[in-house]
Curated annotation (Swiss-Prot):
CDD domains with a match to the protein in the record: AdoMet_MTases (cd02440), SH3_PRMT2 (cd11806)
SMART domains: SH3
Gene: prmt2
Any one GO BP annotation for this protein: developmental cell growth
Identification of the protein by name: Protein arginine N-methyltransferase 2
Organism of provenance: Xenopus laevis (African clawed frog)
Ranges of residues in domain SAM-dependent MTase PRMT-type: 101-405
Residues given in the record as S-adenosyl-L-methionine binding sites: H114, R123, G147, E170, E199
SH3 domain segment(s): 29-88
Amino acid sequence: MESSSECSSISDFQDSTEGDDANTLPENLCMREYVVICDYVATDNTQLSLCSGDKVLLLNAVSQDWWWVNHNGTCGYVPASHLHDALNEQEDTEVNDPWQDEEYYGSYKTLKLHLEMLSDVPRTMTYQNVILKNSSSLCGKHILDLGCGTGIISFFCAKFAQPEAVYAVEASKIAEQTCRLVEQNGISSLVHVIRQQAEELDLPTKVDVLVSEWMGTCLLFEFMLESVLQARDRWLKEDGVMWPSTACIHLVPCSAYKEYSNKVLFWDNPYQLDFSLLKPPATKEFFAKPQPDYILQPEDCLSEPCTLFHLNLKTLQVAELERMNCDFTFLVHTNGLLHGFTAWFSVQFENLEEQGHLELNTGPFSPLTHWKHTLFMLDEPLQVQKRDKISGSVVFERNSVWRRHMSVTLSWVISRELKMQKVGCKVFPIWR
Ligand SMILES: N=C(N)NC/C=C/[C@H]1O[C@@H](n2cnc3c(N)ncnc32)[C@H](O)[C@@H]1O
């Protein structure tokens, strides 16, 4: 596991931060007992292998990511994410639930997020168009609307098509409101609201269509996709339809001068004072994680975007989500500053009644959606010019402990006329 600062690896990070107070956590965290919440297998002789439930004594929190502990007389490094403060035991539901379901479903029980999603016209109208354009194919069919929220997709099915039944499955408390909406609109003989986690679902029959709006930041965050794939394997007929049918993640190198100026250059001379020593901590504080609500302007793209991953949701396996990596090469088409990379996703819906497919694209060349764009800022901007090449790789790695979270590792090489100019690498947690 690497730290979140650029070009560092754990061994460099350990050497450079040994006894470095700037990186140790407050003393009050040390000399306390911690419980291991997830097995860990050491990857070198400075680390300890531990099992879930082991108790350790924290000796030195050398960084946010790695802690030096004593376990039954043996000392070594373990990932801090695998430890929980045994003396300050939170509710079991919080600590022992790597899916954080109580917090997760709690966030969907109020109207805030549902209002945001329903207010997203490109998102919601895409689903309406999919139902509209396939209405005759849906006649007499069984449909599963997974994570239905307020039931909007199920309402579209009842309003624009004549399916046999729609199973509107929703685990959060909002399902109580969804029930009332379905009754009030007189469609309860067609739309069956089931307040249940999809994983525990019991339906009277397999379904012809599994439709869901499961996409999170960078497509995968929340990993609701795992629930969708499990429901596919359990409830979708062999020749059934997945909507969305495919999903893509796109990336482009970009300038983000205003972001960099507002968050870092600001410290050069606020009110004509030199606060520039705050620029490094500002960079770490504001750019260690991606900005999930960034709006990339098309003119800030430094090259054509590329498609990193193209997922087929009829065949994708949950295990493939653990780690996905892809190489990329961008040909810079504009002189400028490379401040970072921006990512977004698109999803495609197979059309059952004519050639082609419908698409919801959340990128900078399509109508803005509530997902906006995800900006990965480098620690330092890099000068690039037309015809430079930015090649490298990206790794999406699912968090082995917190199962709704992931990290994105970006590695890049900037070359000019075949001569290597700049090399870099940075790990971005989303969000743990
Ligand atoms: N599109 C975004 N960002 N969020 C996805 C939308 C999430 C909605 O789906 C529900 N949901 C998520 N996972 C499950 C599950 N396994 N079983 C039943 N309901 C579920 C949540 O409570 C939200 O209402």
